[in-house]
Amino acid sequence: MYTVMDYLKYYRDIPFTEVSLNQLDFLICAILVYLPLNDFKEAKSLKDFSKIALELENKDYDGMMIPKSYEVLKYLQNAKRYANMKIMNFVNLKNEKTQFGACKFLMDKKTIIAFKGTDGSTIGWVENFRLLYDYPTYTQRLSLNYLEDNIKFNDKNVYVVGHSKGGNLAMASVMELSRPLFKKVKKVYNFDGPGFLKKEFDSLKYRELLPKLVNIIPTGSVVGSLLFNKNYKIGRAHV
């Protein structure tokens, strides 16, 4: 079965001028945001970002995606394709109210904003269940605030992505943006994340989101099939 690691092994040194930025590059951003770093604002090179992250690797962390994020980072850190990547405004928040993470990437003259999915914490799973009966949740409101703060006046090519719960946050935050900021978003990539309650699914805001929305779920997905959504691409590739 094709994985993101297969993509990295083949394309890691192929520049964007030869193979354009695509959904697997966006998936890589959605994986890197799981790394257990402390918050930072200033832009970091991939080299500096990798150094900080790898120093924290052997600590005890919640979540199945953290080992995968380190696997991807190790293969990515010296890749020519991503040599000019910048990472900034990293948020890794967990308290009694929320488990929330986000990060902004600059790559190939594009802005990519990635939202973190659920880790192994209790509050992270509680939030997943809240999606079944509440909108907007506290974390969805945080994602909107983050997006509003990170789309700049001169941004023209903004992509918003996320895996699992992060995919839902990507959709919800773009859906609730003011129209001037909404127009700056080119695409929203939801990688195996749940949809919406029926009221939001039937709303005008959701219908306006659809032309920008790509939902990618692997065969046999459970989380990505929850609630109401459209524009599915069923794939055989896995994270």
Where are the regions a protein language model picked out?
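Alpha/beta hydrolase fold serine-hydrolase catalytic domain that processes acyl esters and thioesters
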Residues: 1-2, 6-21, 29, 34-39, ...
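Gly/Ala-rich beta-loop-alpha elbow adjacent to hydrolase catalytic centers
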Residues: 161-166, 170
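Short glycine-enriched nucleophile-adjacent loop
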Residues: 170-179
